[in-house]
Amino acid sequence: MFRAELHRLAGRQAEALANADEAVKISRETGPAFLGPFALGALALASEDPTVRRAALAEGEALLEAGAVSHNHLLFPRDAIEAYLEAGDWEGVERSAAGLAQYTHSEPLPFTDFYVARARALAVLGGQRSSAESLTAEFERLRKEGERLGLRVALGEIVKAIEKMRG
């Protein structure tokens, strides 16, 4: 999964897809509850085929509901949020953010709080459901928080949103 993510971030889509496919195959052979949702999230991000993406997201969500190991409840929603953002599926973004928030409700984590707030702000912007002024302040806050947490990979969309809002 990590190789798939690195290839995807470097713009090597074919390699990302091959690595994600292999990760899903291995997770199915060895027990999908351990890394299955995480692998399926990587596949959803690596695939440019909407059918493959939707199937990977649906299967990952089903595995979480069936009872996957804890790290999947943190990493799959992060990737699902990204996949839904790329697809412009604001309901999917909101649903994944809500699931992540619910999972960490009793033990909040800065990592998940950041991704939940980021997802919700980007969904609001994408759905054009808020004033520019309030959203700009939230994106500025998220940019600072993302920098503080070292989550540089998540900052690109935030910076784009700030630039878009400033016109």
Model regions and ranges:
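Conserved binding/catalytic microenvironments
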Residues: 1-6, 10-11, 18-22, 26-27, ...
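Alpha-solenoid helical repeat architecture
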Residues: 1-3, 11-14, 27-43, 64-79, ...
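Residue at a conserved register position within TPR or TPR-like alpha-solenoid repeats
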Residues: 7, 40, 47, 84, ...
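Residue-level detector of the short coil/turn that links helix A to helix B
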Residues: 11, 48-51, 88
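Single-residue signature of alpha-solenoid repeat helices
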Residues: 16, 53-56, 93, 131, ...
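The canonical alpha-helical register within tetratricopeptide repeats
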Residues: 22, 29, 59-62, 66, ...
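Compact structured core domains
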Residues: 70-71, 84-88
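C-terminal structured "cap/appendage" subdomains that terminate the fold
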Residues: 116-167
